[in-house]
């Protein structure tokens, strides 16, 4: 088992993402990989909508280090495949989307659904089962309203389930709102944040910077362990 990285909290505007969390749907505590704001230029002003934190299971570090250790933060940030390896990696992931401006559940879920369907149709992988899953996804959000400080929480398992939870007070709830069994949806939701066209470039850069450091720490710890075992 990989030792947990020495993660620290990150503040995005007034939102503080803690170093580790145990979200609904996760089998273990996850560490904070990175965080950043999501915003958009509107009439010459950068309007910030949400803060997004991305958490990973400890074993993400040795899994990613096989290919990516030794790469700089800039090299990782520029690599589409690096983020793809996070999205598809055999470890748990958790995304916390916390409101800076208010948003209705209907607005949020319709936007995410449109994005997912567009991706799947472009890939030629859209099926009737996906239509049913999207309908369930929209249903979960339809009566929700998210005020500033409230959060939408997504836990993605390596088996392909997507656990959705809501928080109105900044705390991570113990119970999930719903679990959807659809690997494509689970992966596309996390990819919408950190993928090639991810909504938060700041979160992507944060993730690359911290994971570059964590992989270096992991490599140094592994070397020290081997040296101690052989008496160096």
From Swiss-Prot:
Pathway: Secondary metabolite biosynthesis; flavonoid biosynthesis. Keywords: Flavonoid biosynthesis, Isomerase. InterPro entries: CFI, Chalcone_isomerase, Chalcone_isomerase_3-sand, Chalcone_isomerase_bundle_sf, Chalcone_isomerase_sf. GO terms for biological process: flavonoid biosynthetic process. Its EC number is 5.5.1.6. The record marks 108 as: Important for catalytic activity. It comes from the Eukaryota. It catalyses: a chalcone = a flavanone. Substrate binds at residues 50, 192. Pfam families: Chalcone. One of its GO terms (molecular function) is chalcone isomerase activity. Part of the biosynthetic pathway for all classes of flavonoids, a large class of secondary plant metabolites, many of which are brightly colored. Belongs to the chalcone isomerase family. PANTHER family: CHALCONE--FLAVANONE ISOMERASE 1-RELATED (PTHR28039:SF8), CHALCONE--FLAVONONE ISOMERASE 1-RELATED (PTHR28039). Catalyzes the intramolecular cyclization of bicyclic chalcones into tricyclic (S)-flavanones. Responsible for the isomerization of 4,2',4',6'-tetrahydroxychalcone (also termed chalcone) into naringenin. This is Chalcone--flavanone isomerase. It comes from Saussurea medusa. The lineage of its organism: Eukaryota, Viridiplantae, Streptophyta, Embryophyta, Tracheophyta.
